[in-house]
From Swiss-Prot:
Gene that this sequence comes from: atpB
Record keywords, A-Z: ATP synthesis, Cell inner membrane, Cell membrane, CF(0), Hydrogen ion transport, Ion transport, Membrane, Transmembrane, Transmembrane helix, Transport
Segment forming the signal sequence: none
Chief place where the protein resides: membrane
Transmembrane segments: 29-49, 89-109, 134-154, 177-197, 208-228, 235-255
Identification of the protein by name: ATP synthase subunit a
Membership in a protein family: Belongs to the ATPase A chain family.
Amino acid sequence: MAATGEALTPQGYIQHHLTNLSVGEGFWTWHIDSLFFSVGLGVLFLWLFRSVGKKATTGVPGKLQCFVEMIVEFVDSSVKETFHGRNPVIAPLALTIFVWVFMMNFMDMVPVDWIPELAMAAGIPYMKVVPTTDLNITFSMAIGVFLLIIYYSIKVKGISGFVKELTLQPFNHKAMIPVNLLLETVTLIAKPISLALRLFGNLYAGELIFILIALMYGANWALSTLGVTLQLGWLIFHILVITLQAFIFMMLTIVYLSMAHEDH
């Protein structure tokens, strides 16, 4: 499959599947496919949970309601065990992060050629369907968490308290202020960077493995048979990966915001 309709080499096939549909150039490049799927899945999440919430009954719940309630209770218990402050925003935020990230990760379960082939038939040359394999998406979410950390740190501790936290820890001496400021600034900035890169790295690697396995289908029958076995095995294992990465992103967000609420 190729944008020009010609057969691709293995290298070209891999590159094609790792290329976003984009407009603009340089810093102002917009990845249309990542935005479409991330926003679309976010809207689907809101619609689904709102629909279940409106139809919730005290009687015998349906399967979908049971599933949603199970997710909500799991996230709520995770917040209660981890977050030590009082903030009604944290639980809904954690639920949104967990479900939204999981849904974006779950797009990696779709066979790698299905949606790109449909896009090609419609005249669209590139189509990446897993938003969390786009560093722009993972960094956008991580920066959002980072801004919340700064906001609640200042709201709870005040500007002076926040500045003291940056300048008087871990060494409580005026002479160590430059060292403290350097250490705390690096620690603070490392939080969104680690959030973004961890999610991106795991999902990008998972997608690349699916693409490499898909290449085997174009070889002889022996490699094609092996490819089916490998894809099934990796699919089962990857379900654990995508769930775990959504959980880790949620838990680290809760931990970071809990730390922001701690008034030293």
